[in-house]
Structures are given as structure tokens and as C-alpha cells.
A protein has these predicted regions:
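AMP-forming adenylation/ATP pyrophosphatase catalytic core
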Residues: 9-36, 56, 91, 108, ...
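Non-catalytic, well-ordered alpha-helical scaffold segments
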Residues: 38, 136-137, 203-207, 221-225, ...
Length: 297
């Protein structure tokens, strides 16, 4: 078994953080005490002087697991020992919805992150999403169906709630590399018990589907990452062209009907979808078809 080169891992993380403009900045790390976020936190602490970054940590006690109390105590002690500003939110069980708990938990997390960013004048939220997350998310979207735009890769940087940026420097690493780094440096972390449950689609893919695909080709995850990035690049080019076209056929806040219907059916669809996206409107595929049919009737 090939041993992970710790120095190489840290140099790659350092270069990625520099590429993402995380130097001389005040940042907020989203930490769950899982292996991914603890490796990110530990790695950035080692690189903090070189990068000249001021690290802050946000942690949410979701009250979803037996060990959440122990995890909360651990992260408090970890940050206190290293003089790291820590912001904790406790999501009380009484506030948990009966259904769609994952979606609700995500909303709670990001509302809390925004609050901390705003109150502490921090622009960058750093998360520990990694390469395996990228592939799993792609497969989940593929199964769910919908607009091809939704199949784009998880972005290394994206705007968050208009005023902030989410930065994901760990996308260049796979899960095995992260585990290996934690093991070699003796980094303490907690395993989420729910990761073992097949009640969640991501876990079913991780436990049963992806291993079969990896058996067919060990480079499967790498190939998925390549395809999603190619798709993202191509869609971004189309979006840029669409924005130019939209400017030409827009009339104040609306589209110029006469100019719009002169476009090919393919471009009509692209322009309509882009127009609705810019306006912040989400509609179903059947509704897009109905609108296009009415416009061309």
C-alpha cells in the first residue's frame, strides 16, 4: 500500500487556497467534527502563518445523534486550546420537522453561517467538500432528473447570499487521501453514525452502487469529476453567449417578442431558461414547454 505523502498533500492544499485567493483574509470554516472538516481545519491551521489567514470556526449541534454532546465538547476544547474564535448554534429537537429533515438542517446551517459572516465582517465561508462528494452529488442529480444545468460540478468558489463567497479547497482530494492524512497526523474526528444507514440516498450510492462502478473501473470517480467539469465549462460558455443574446433581445424588463421568435427553437429554450434564472424564477420543464408553445403559436 502506497503511503500518503503528507508534505505533498499540504503543498497541494496551500496552492489551492492561494489559487482561490484565500491569503491575507479572515475566513469562517464550517466544521462538523467529521474527518473532512477536521482535516481541513488542521491543514489550514498548519498553513495559517504562510497564508496569513485569520481562522474562525462555525459549528452546529443538530441534536440528531447520540454523540452530538460529546462532539460539541470536543470542538469547544479544540478551539479554546488553539485560541480559535468559535461560533456554536444548537438546533433544538423541538424545532426539527417531521419530514425533510436533511433539507431543514441545511437551511438551518446556512442561515447560521450567514449570521456569523455578517456579524463578524467575514466574506469567505470555507467548506470541506471533496472529490467523492462531487461524484456522489452528480449521480444523485442524474437519478433525480431535471435540467442539465443541475448536473454541473460543485464549484470551487460560488457567491453565497449575494454578499459572501463559499470556497471549497478540498475538491482536489478524494476521501481516501483525507482519511490517510488524518491517520498519519493522528487527527481526531468523529464518524457520523448516520453515514452507515441506507435510509439516505447518498449512503446507498456510497455503499452499494459506487463500489460496483469502481470495480468496473477504479478510475470511475476521477472520470466523473472530469465529465462534470467539462459539462460545467461548456455550459458556462453557452451562458455567456446567452447573456449577450439576451441583452440584444431585451426591452426594459421584458423580452422583445419579435426578436425572440426569430431565434432557433434551441436558442429560444436556452434564452427563456436563462431569462427565468436571472429573474430568480424556477419553473418545471413542462411549463417551459408550454410557454415556448404559446410564444410560437
Amino acid at each position: 500500500m502506497i503511503k500518503l505523502n503528507v508534505k505533498k498533500f499540504e503543498n497541494q492544499l496551500l496552492q489551492r487556497l492561494r489559487d482561490l485567493k484565500i491569503s491575507n483574509k479572515k475566513v469562517l470554516l464550517a466544521v462538523s467534527t467529521g474527518v473532512d472538516s477536521m482535516v481541513l481545519l488542521s491543514g489550514m491551521l498548519k498553513l495559517s502563518k504562510v497564508l496569513n489567514v485569520e481562522i474562525n470556526v462555525a459549528y452546529i449541534d443538530h441534536q440528531l445523534r447520540e454523540q452530538s454532546k460529546e462532539e460539541t465538547k470536543f470542538i469547544k476544547e479544540f478551539c479554546f486550546a488553539r485560541n480559535i474564535p468559535l461560533y456554536v448554534y444548537r438546533w433544538e429537537k423541538e424545532e426539527h420537522p417531521v419530514q425533510s429533515i436533511e433539507a431543514a438542517a441545511r437551511e438551518v446551517r446556512y442561515n447560521f453561517f450567514e449570521k456569523v459572516l455578517k456579524e463578524n465582517n467575514i466574506e469567505y465561508l470555507v467548506t470541506a467538500h471533496h472529490g467523492d462528494d462531487q461524484a456522489e452529488t452528480f449521480l444523485m442529480k442524474l437519478i433525480r432528473g431535471g435540467n442539465i444545468q443541475q448536473l454541473q460540478a460543485i464549484q470551487s468558489v460560488r457567491i453565497f447570499r449575494e454578499n459572501y463567497q463559499i470556497v471549497r479547497p478540498m475538491l482536489i482530494f478524494n476521501k481516501k487521501e483525507i482519511y490517510d492524512y488524518a491517520k498519519q497526523l493522528g487527527i481526531k474526528y468523529y464518524e457520523d453514525e448516520t453515514n452507515k444507514s441506507d435510509d439516505y440516498q447518498r449512503n446507498r450510492l456510497r455503499h452499494h452502487i459506487i463500489p460496483v462502478l469502481k470495480a468496473e473501473n477504479p478510475e470511475f470517480l476521477k472520470h466523473v469529476l472530469g465529465y462534470t467539469q467539462q459539462l460545467t465549462n461548456n455550459l458556462q460558455v453557452i451562458q455567456e453567449v446567452a447573456d449577450v443574446k439576451l441583452n440584444k433581445i431585451s426591452k426594459e424588463e421584458t423580452l422583445d417578442y419579435d426578436k425572440f421568435v426569430k431565434e432557433s427553437p434551441l436558442w429560444q429554450r436556452i434564452l427563456l431558461e436563462r431569462y427565468l434564472e436571472v429573474k430568480g424564477l424556477e419553473i418545471k420543464e413542462t411549463q417551459v414547454q408550454q410557454i415556448l408553445a404559446m410564444l410560437n403559436d
